[in-house]
Amino acid sequence: MDKIVAKIAALGVPGLVLVITIGATGLAGGAAITAALAALGPGGMIGGIATLGVLGLISEGIAKYGMDAIFSAVVIELYKRGETKESILNKIQKYPVSKDLKRRLRESLEKVERKEE
């Protein structure tokens, strides 16, 4: 059942985003779809389609691993790619997440920093 829920979430989120954007355009039919896709991403309709694809991948990852694990992996990858600890801490501070998750992200950064030494 978990696999089914993950697939529904991965397919459902981009669809929901598109439906909401179509509703926000105030248009109907093909014009609504065109306007919604153009509004979703950079570069017009093609960018909107790409944005929905990326949104699908992200939502599938969140459904499979959880938001905490995804955020933690991103913080660790930023460090491995050479970003400074200070710049990563600034990014963590700006993330729209709970204080508890920010604390865990800082702890993840500390652990990976200790392993690198």
List the predicted regions and their residue ranges.
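Small-residue-rich hydrophobic membrane-insertion segments
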Residues: 4-70
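Amphipathic, membrane-inserting segments
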Residues: 62-117
